[in-house]
Design a protein with these regions (language model features):
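Flexible "arm" and connector segments at domain edges
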Residues: 1-58, 64-194, 198-263
């Protein structure tokens, strides 16, 4: 028995009405969904840490999510694991005509252009009337914003140079500050303007060839690393963070930054 069949058999036993696991038998598509998201992020974390032993395990956990959905779908007569494999195989062959068909592609740009053309044709066949119809609302907000912007760009709704993109960021900053300076701040309006500013910043990242979600993840990691070092230095001086003034913490923060630059 190959390992895929072994995994499928394990999943079937876990869901068996007679001898299965009580917890696994109670699960539904909706109840499993949060675990799928969690496992996806754990895969990304292992990749970021370049921990490939851990990555092997996390990919297994993610694969188990797919198998879980397949088992539940099979029980309801919707589809099974083979149908999932067939669907992705068909899609890959269809979207790579330069490999499995008669067309040619000279570089990655040719591939991506053709890929988007094929996706547009597929959306038309599904009676999707907007270029934005199949963008999942459950995507992380930065990722979804960038995907929306890319789809709009694919149909020509986009600036062709960086200048207007940067100008838009400054415009949105001005609008945020206008709301901040009101005698009575309208929090709903301020939130709206902050959203516009973040959206414009994501668009700037896209025009610069940067993935906003990844950039922010790295910024989070950098800030966390530096703050932990600030905590360590403050503790080494025999002090508590809550008892140190902001000026001292800023001094230590700058020291940590200089140490990183010198490495």
């Amino acid at each position: 028995m190959n390992q895929i069949d072994r995994l499928l058999n394990i999943m079937q036993r876990l869901r068996d009405p007679e001898g299965g696991c009580p917890w696994d038998k109670e699960q539904t598509f909706a109840s499993i969904a949060p675990y799928t998201l969690e496992e996806t992020y754990e895969v990304l974390d292992a990749i970021a840490r370049e921990d490939f032993d851990d990555l092997r395990g996390e990919l297994g956990d993610l694969l188990f999510q797919v198998v879980f959905y397949a088992q539940m779908a099979q029980e309801e007569g919707l589809f099974d694991f083979n149908d999932i494999c067939a669907a992705i195989s068909d899609k890959l062959e269809r979207r790579h005509p330069h490999v499995f068909g008669e067309l040619s592609a000279n570089n990655s740009e040719d591939v991506l252009v053709r890929w988007e053309q094929i996706k547009t044709e597929e959306r038309a066949q599904k009676a999707q009337h907007s270029a934005l119809d199949d963008i999942p609302r459950s995507l992380p907000a930065l990722m979804r914003a960038q995907k929306i912007q890319k789809r709009c760009s694919n149909v020509g709704f986009d600036w062709t140079t960086l200048g207007p993109v940067v100008d838009k960021v400054y415009e949105e900053i001005d609008e945020v500050m206008f709301e901040v300076r009101q005698a009575v701040v309208d929090q709903a309006k301020l939130e709206e303007e902050m959203g516009d500013l973040i959206f414009a910043t994501v668009n700037m990242a896209r025009h610069l060839g940067t993935k906003a979600e990844l950039a922010l993840q790295k910024a989070n990691d950098k800030f966390e690393r530096r703050f932990r070092e600030v905590e360590r230095i403050v503790a080494a001086r025999g002090l508590e963070m809550t008892g140190v003034d902001l000026e001292t913490m800023e001094e230590v923060w700058q020291e940590v930054k200089r140490q990183e630059i010198d490495l």
